[in-house]
């Protein structure tokens, strides 16, 4: 059988569903998004017949992705949402050359927010829900390339699965493996396991493809003092932290406070790793988070910290995006949460665009794919106020499966001319898109993109990717929780109540 995964073609190549990254409860799709998925499914069947292909063969082609995105355009336009769209010619639904032109590219893609966890047996051990566990995770589908070979029968989320989903099933060239906010003892991915994943990639001659963060939560005793040891032992490329984190549930902390923020920044400076990545926006699950979760996820401290520490690069993970409020154009005001709180903080502290603050897109872009008009506002605001050289690519995968659909959607996304004229948003040109995909993040991570691309072009991972794509068999699956019940099971699994 040609396809081991989804042989009937029931799954769309652009995965717009309720899946989350486990940090917040799934939210239902809007009517227009449900209509978009339904129309895309109908068009896939019709276009497959016109092309003389099976439904699955059609959907795994670039025409299948183009057909899906074109259906999304049609459904959203019918709902009056025309501020953003996927810029694809109609012919791409049936003409492979047109689809390839629209959906493929040679950009350097550097995903600075990747996740996996250690083998599930150990992770599940403390939980009373071991018997049911993450029953929604399609572990039986993780026999990717060769069921009898090195890549066969791996568990979802492990290092091998991460390497396959990230580097074989997507166009990602480099990635950063990051962490979730827990105490060190409860981390679902420890520093040594992250380093082991990097070694797995390097064993495939994939040196330089995977970097790792050092997790530091300054209000946990000992975390700041461990930073030098972490850097020396694991060669961390940046620090990852969470201002919502709380050891007692009472309060978080701020980047500009003297008790926690200032010591963290100084210790980062002392290690020589002057890059601090801060989760902002998306609410996080209790009990490890403060009760004022959304408040401490706001960005009012970012501008102050950036102004006081011009030698430090602050990368705002998720760009401060808050899922509870629909984004529109920015207007100055008392913004305490959301993307607008980031912009307001920069403006109040005279931080001009393209300074030492970066806006990262992990989960944010994936969530915005539901609503291209909201996407136009969020992307437009970030590019206008944070800067065209300071918006950086991240996907939060592999919670969302392979990030290839996020890449294809962003490759074709455009802000409508009417929005550009009315709000001063820039056109997303191929050159700007390439900067967001990888060039912008190369500065804080101290990469020479030319040297990296030259090396990556001929390593074993590149050769394996080329061979695999002669007969690709993507799963089109997502792995994070998709319903509230799954989300609650997931929290219990991690020891949350």
Each language-model region and where it sits:
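Hydrophobic faces of well-ordered beta-strands that scaffold small-molecule active sites
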Residues: 110-114, 175-177, 212-214, 239-241, ...
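N-terminal twin-arginine translocation
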Residues: 41, 45-60, 68-96
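Catalytic pocket-lining loop regions of alpha/beta-barrel enzymes
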Residues: 251-393, 401, 418-429, 475-496
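Mid-to-C-terminal alpha-helical segments outside catalytic/metal-binding sites
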Residues: 53-70, 95-102, 108, 123-124, ...
């Amino acid at each position: 059988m040609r396809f081991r995964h989804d042989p009937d073609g029931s799954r769309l190549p652009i995965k717009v569903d309720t899946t989350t990254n486990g940090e917040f409860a799934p939210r239902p799709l809007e009517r227009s998004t449900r209509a978009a998925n339904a129309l895309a499914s109908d068009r896939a069947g019709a276009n497959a017949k016109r092309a003389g292909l099976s439904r699955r063969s059609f959907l795994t082609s670039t025409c299948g992705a183009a057909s899906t995105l074109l259906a999304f355009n049609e459904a959203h336009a019918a709902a009056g949402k025309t501020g953003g769209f996927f810029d694809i010619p109609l012919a791409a639904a049936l003409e492979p050359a047109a689809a390839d032109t629209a959906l493929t590219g040679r950009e350097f893609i550097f995903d600075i927010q990747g996740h996996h966890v250690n083998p599930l047996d150990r992770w599940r051990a403390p939980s009373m829900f071991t018997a049911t566990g993450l029953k929604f995770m399609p572990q039986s589908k993780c026999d990717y390339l060769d069921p009898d070979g090195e890549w066969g029968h791996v568990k979802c989320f492990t290092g091998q699965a991460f390497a396959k989903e990230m580097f074989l099933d997507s166009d990602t060239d480099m990635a950063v493996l990051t962490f979730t906010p827990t105490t060190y003892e409860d981390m679902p991915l420890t520093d040594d396991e992250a380093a082991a994943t990097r070694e797995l990639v390097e064993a495939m001659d994939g040196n330089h493809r995977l970097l790792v963060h050092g997790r530091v939560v300054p209000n946990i005793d000992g975390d700041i003092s461990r930073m030098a040891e972490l850097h020396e032992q694991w060669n961390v490329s940046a620090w990852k932290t969470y201002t919502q984190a709380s050891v007692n549930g009472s309060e978080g902390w701020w980047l500009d406070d003297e008790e926690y923020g200032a010591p963290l920044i100084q210790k980062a400076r002392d290690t020589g790793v002057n890059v601090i990545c801060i989760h902002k926006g998306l609410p996080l699950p209790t009990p490890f988070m403060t009760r004022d979760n959304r408040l401490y996820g706001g960005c009012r401290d970012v501008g102050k910290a950036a102004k006081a520490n011009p030698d430090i690069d602050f990368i705002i993970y998720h760009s401060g995006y808050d899922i509870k409020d629909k984004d529109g154009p920015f207007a100055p005001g008392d913004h305490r949460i959301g993307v607008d709180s980031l912009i307001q903080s920069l403006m109040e502290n005279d931080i001009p665009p393209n300074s030492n603050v970066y806006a990262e897109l992990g989960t944010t872009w994936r969530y915005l794919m539901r609503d291209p008009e909201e996407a136009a506002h969020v992307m437009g605001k970030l590019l206008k106020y944070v800067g065209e050289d300071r918006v950086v690519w991240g996907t939060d995968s592999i919670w969302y499966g392979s990030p290839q659909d996020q890449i294809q959607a962003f490759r074709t996304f455009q802000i409508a001319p009417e929005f550009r004229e009315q709000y001063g948003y820039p056109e997303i040109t191929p050159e700007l898109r390439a900067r967001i995909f990888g060039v912008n993040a190369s500065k804080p991570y101290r990469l020479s993109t030319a040297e990296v691309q030259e090396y990556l072009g001929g390593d074993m991972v590149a050769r394996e990717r080329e061979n695999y794509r002669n007969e690709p068999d993507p799963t089109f699956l997502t792995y994070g929780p998709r319903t509230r019940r799954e989300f609650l099971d997931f929290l219990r699994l991690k020891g949350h109540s």
